[in-house]
Curated annotation (Swiss-Prot):
Expressed by the venom gland. InterPro entries: Huwentoxin-1, Huwentoxin_CS1. The keyword Disulfide bond applies. This is Hainantoxin-III 10. Keywords: Amidation, Disulfide bond, Ion channel impairing toxin, Knottin, Neurotoxin, Presynaptic neurotoxin, Secreted, Signal, Toxin, Voltage-gated sodium channel impairing toxin. It comes from Cyriopagopus hainanus (Chinese bird spider).
Length: 83
């Protein structure tokens, strides 16, 4: 009788410890995932030499990427329609 009570108690303790350990791992998972997603140092993008759609520009300097033109009225890169 004492042995069965001891085994039952040991089983409950083990179940509690395993549950607590898995729960703490689950709490760390979102932090690890976010740190991997926002790790910008590993995947630094190349800087473009030209400016894309909506970027501010100076008219006449040809700073916009191909197929874009600097609008003299708004002073930002727009799609060049070839007028």
């Amino acid at each position: 009788m004492k042995a069965s009570m001891f085994l039952a108690l040991a089983g409950l303790v083990r179940l509690f410890v395993v549950g607590y350990a898995s729960e703490s791992e689950e709490k760390e998972f979102p932090r690890e995932l976010l740190s991997k997603i926002f790790a910008v140092d590993d995947f630094k993008g190349e800087e473009r030499g030209c400016k894309g759609f909506g970027d501010s520009c100076t008219p006449g300097k040809n700073e916009c990427c191909p197929n874009y033109a600097c609008s003299s009225k708004h002073k930002w890169c727009k799609v060049y329609l070839g007028k």
